Every structure is written in C-alpha cells, then in structure tokens.
Amino acid sequence: MGCGMSTEEKEGKARNEEIENQLKRDRLQQRNEIKMLLLGAGESGKSTILKQMKLIHEGGYSRDERESFKEIIFSNTVQSMRVILEAMESLELPLEDQRMEYHVQTIFMQPAQIEGDVLPPEVGNAIEALWKDRGVQECFKRSREYQLNDSARYYFDNIARIAAPDYMPNDQDVLRSRVKTTGITETTFIIGDLTYRMFDVGGQRSERKKWIHCFENVTTILFLVAISEYDQLLFEDETVNRMQEALTLFDSICNSRWFIKTSIILFLNKIDRFKEKLPISPMKNYFPDYEGGDDYAAACDYILNRFVSLNQHETKQIYTHFTCATDTTQIRFVMAAVNDIIIQENLRLCGLI
C-alpha cells in the first residue's frame, strides 16, 4: 500500500489550510476594524451622529432615501403640534384667537403616522396658523414641563416649505427627524485605512438590557449627553431629571468592568439649545451647587467636571467635545479629531506605541 494521502485526507488538509488562512485574514481585518459603541440616554443625539457619518463619509442620501424620510418628517411635525395642543389643555393655556379651534380639530383628526408623499394642505395650513398664535407660543416656551421633540420649532418654522407639493427633504430636515431606536443598528463606513463599525443602541431604559451583546472587543465608546436637558424629566419616568439619569448611566459605563481598557469619548451635545435655555431656565434650580449664573462657559465647565469626575480609573482617559449634532461642519471637524484619537488608541492596543 502506498504512503500517499487519500482524497479524504487531502480535502481535510485543504480545509484546515483554508480555515488558517481565514483566521489570518480575520486577524488582519480586526486590526483595521474599529468597533465603536454609541451610548447615551434616549434622545441624546446618537442616531443624528450616525446620519452625519452617512453625510460626511458615504456621499449623503439618495433621492429615494430622502423620499423615505417624508412620512417621518410629516409625522414628527404633526405629532409635535398635537403634543403642544394637549399640553395647553393640561396647563390651562387658552388660544389667543378662538377661531383657531377649527385648526386644532384638524390636527387632532390626523393619525399618529402620516402617510403619503405630500402633507395634506389643510394640515400645513393648520400648523402654520397655530404656530403664530400667542397661546401656542406661550405653551412652547414651557416645553420643559412636558415631552416635546427638539425638532418641533425647526419644522414649524419651515412648514410652508415642508407642506409644498414638490417638497423634498434636505440634509437638515433628515438630521432633525426622529424615530425611536429599538434594538441595535449597525452602520459601517471607511475612513482612510480604517473600517468603522458603529453600533447605535436604544437609549430608553427598556432598551439598555440589550447593550450587553455589543460589549465584546469594543475599541471605543462614544457617549452622548444632551446637556440642554438639565431642566427636563425622563420620558419613561417623570420623577427623574434627564441630566441626573445621564450622570448615573455614564458612571455605570465609565467604571464598568467590561470597559476597563476601553477609551471613552464624551460628546456634550445640543450646545445650541443649552445656550438658549440658560438665561430662561436657571441651572441652579436643578443643580443647587452650581454658582455660575447664566454664564455659558461656567455652565459648560460645571457639566464637564460633573461627568469627568465620575471616572475612578487613574489610567483611563476621557476625551471630551462640546457638540451640536445637527451641525455637519462642526461634526466633520470633531470626528476628524476622534479619528486621530482612535488611531492612537489602536496603535497602543497593538503594542506599536
């Protein structure tokens, strides 16, 4: 009997070699692959950052993709006006012009999800008229007392364009659209030699138990905080301040055994709304130890220190940026800085620096 390999053995050897080669390819790919986990409480701006990545690194949205945002934008706009009108009832704020009642009924007759390529003219007219009413404006000023989308004013101010028969969502319309994230969404994009896999997980409390599946081999965490929400309560629990919830969540993530060696990039987001709110809603009412009045720089420093001081690991670096997630120019600049940080962290983890 000869000493040559049987066909079966040859096939087995070929399979083993293929597996070895695949493992080598995987190891090489992992070195150039960045797994980034987006964390933060609900409505902190995580999904907006993902949309920015598409605009900055993937050539933006096609016409068909923009079309698909129409119904979301219509629904966000109508729902926001409905929320204000309901709040007017509970806060006992009357319409200045009672003739507006006809428009109120038009809004309440709309379904939760607006379908179709065009916003019905009577709905656009109702929103435009109601938004000019002083009673509606007064209720809007008190929006910290109820749950209103950040995008409400933007869509109301642009309602004539949004309600036009030939309306096509622009970048800003898309960035400000809101759909609650449930489960885990993954976005992949390439910057230079690196492939980024960015995971967005639902921020509401009920979604957090699902985060565990994203924890393994994460290169970095991008943690978002909506600092403008210092005077607001949670959607899920209206006894809890949103900023306090963000601090609690950041503490648990920053000091978790899962993330001892993971770099954390902290985006203190929604600085535009924060700056608007400070003179109107004193931060000291919600954080009694704050002494900076309505000084924007002092308020930013206070919030930054509240978060960074939670870090219990001397060797752990937290990189911080103040951001406006809907500002593409600023996010492009900030993400370039983040990319530099990640490259350095990657080289350190590989033992190359």
Curated annotation (Swiss-Prot):
Matching InterPro entries: Fungi_Gprotein_alpha (IPR002975), Gprotein_alpha_su (IPR001019), GproteinA_insert (IPR011025), P-loop_NTPase (IPR027417)
Entry's family note: Belongs to the G-alpha family. G(q) subfamily.
Assembly with partners or alone: G proteins are composed of 3 units; alpha, beta and gamma. The alpha chain contains the guanine nucleotide binding site.
Gene, per the UniProt record: MAGB
Region (G2 motif): 173-181
Name of this chain's protein: Guanine nucleotide-binding protein subunit alpha
Domain G-alpha: 32-353
Region annotated G1 motif, chain positions: 35-48
Covalent lipidation (S-palmitoyl cysteine), chain numbering: 3
Source species of the chain: Pyricularia oryzae (strain 70-15 / ATCC MYA-4617 / FGSC 8958)
UniProt binding sites for Mg(2+): 47, 181
SUPFAM superfamilies (UniProt xref): P-loop containing nucleoside triphosphate hydrolases (SSF52540), Transducin (alpha subunit), insertion domain (SSF47895)
Biased segments, Basic and acidic residues type: 7-21
Gene3D superfamilies referenced in this protein's UniProt entry, alphabetically: GI Alpha 1, domain 2-like, P-loop containing nucleotide triphosphate hydrolases
GO CC, alphabetical: cytoplasm; heterotrimeric G-protein complex
Task performed by this protein: Guanine nucleotide-binding proteins (G proteins) are involved as modulators or transducers in various transmembrane signaling systems. Plays a role in pathogenicity, specifically in appressorium formation in rice blast disease. Also involved in mating.
